[in-house]
C-alpha cells in the first residue's frame, strides 16, 4: 500500500531558466525516490500559458506553485529548491499538526518576500550591466584625455623652441609668427577633441583618408629637428618611391611618428643614429620600422610599455623612461586595424614596428577600421 501523500505542483519557468542549477536540482529531486510524496509536476512556459501569471498573481519567474493540497503556496527566486526542502517535512506532518491545532499555512509576507527578492536580483543584474557599460565609457574617455594631454605637449614645446630660436637670432619674426600660428591651430583642434569627450568615443574622432606616409614622417622629422641636431644624431630613411598611399587619419598618424621618433632620439646616445624604413608588406598593409641604438628594453617589459597607465622606470642614465606616448601609439594603430610591437635587445637597441592599411578606395562609412 502506498502511504505517500499526493502533491500537485506547477513550475512556471522560461526555457533558459530550466537549465539553472537550482531548477535542475529541484526537478531531479522531485523525480527521485528521496521525495516522500506522490508528485504531480507540471512544467509551464509563461509565453505559452500567460494566463498562469495572472491566475496565480506571479510577479517573478521561475516560480513553483503548490496547487494541492490546499492552501496554495508559491516559491520564487533563485533558491526555490532550498525553500521547498524546508516545507516538505512540514507538509508531511500536516495531518498531525492540524489535530494539534497548529496552522502551517504559509505566511503571505514570506511568499511576497521571496518574489521581491527575485525582482531585486533582476534589478541588481541590470544595475551591474549598466555599471559595466559606464565604466567602459569612462575608461574610453580617460584614454582620450590622456592622449590629448600628451599631444598638447608637442605644439607647446615647438612654440617654446621657436621663441628661443628667435631670441638667439636663428629665425626672424615672420618665421616665428608662422610657427606660432601653426601650433595654435593644432591646439585648437585638440581642444575640439576635449569638448567631445563627454559625448563621443575617442575612436569616433578619427578621420581616415588617403595619405602619404613619406610626407608624414618627413614632417615629424623636421618638427623634431632641434632635438636630434642638438645631439648630432643622424636620421636615415629608407622609403620606396613606389610605396602606396595608406588609409589613415593624418593627425593621428603624425602623432605616432612624433612619439616613436622622439623616443628613439631620447634613448639614443649623442652622435648615434636612427633608421626609419617602410615596406609594402602585403597587398593590404604597409609596415613601418623605427630603430635606435639605445640601451634596449628588457624582454619582460616589452609588452607592458604599450599598456595604459604604465610608465617604466628610466632605462639608461639621463632618460625618464617610456611613458604614455606608447600607449597612445597602440590605441591609434589599433583603431586603424593595424598592430604595433617592439623587437629589442639590451645594449643593442630597439626597433618599433607598426602596420597601416593600404588605401584601396575605401572610406570611413565602409567600417574598414576596427577597434583596438
Curated annotation (Swiss-Prot):
SUPFAM superfamilies: ATPase domain of HSP90 chaperone/DNA topoisomerase II/histidine kinase, Homodimeric domain of signal transducing histidine kinase, Thioredoxin-like. It comes from the Bacteria. Keywords: ATP-binding, Biological rhythms, Kinase, Nucleotide-binding, Phosphoprotein, Transferase, Two-component regulatory system. One of its GO terms (biological process) is circadian rhythm. Homooligomerizes. Interacts with KaiC. Participates in the KaiBC complex, whose core is composed of a KaiC homohexamer and 6 KaiB. The keyword Nucleotide-binding applies. It catalyses: ATP + protein L-histidine = ADP + protein N-phospho-L-histidine. It is an enzyme of class 2 (transferase). The gene is sasA. Its EC number is 2.7.13.3. The N-terminus interacts with KaiC, while the C-terminal histidine kinase domain autophosphorylates and is probably responsible for self-oligomerization. The N-terminal domain stimulates the C-terminus to autophosphorylate. Pfam families: HATPase_c, HisKA, KaiB. The modification Phosphohistidine is found at residue 150. Member of the two-component regulatory system SasA/RpaA involved in genome-wide circadian gene expression. One of several clock output pathways. Participates in the Kai clock protein complex, the main circadian regulator in cyanobacteria, via its interaction with KaiC. KaiC enhances the autophosphorylation activity of SasA, which then transfers its phosphate group to RpaA to activate it. In addition to its output function, recruits fold-shifted KaiB (KaiB(fs)) to KaiC to cooperatively form the KaiB(6):KaiC(6) complex (independent of SasA kinase activity). InterPro entries: HATPase_C_sf, His_kinase_dom, HisK_dim/P_dom, HisK_dim/P_sf, KaiB_domain, Kinase_SasA, Light-responsive_reg, Sig_transdc_His_kin-like_C. Gene3D superfamilies: 1.10.287.130, Glutaredoxin, Histidine kinase-like ATPase, C-terminal domain. Residues 147-360 form the Histidine kinase domain. PROSITE patterns: HIS_KIN (PS50109). This is Adaptive-response sensory kinase SasA. GO terms for molecular function: ATP binding; phosphorelay response regulator activity; phosphorelay sensor kinase activity; protein kinase activator activity.
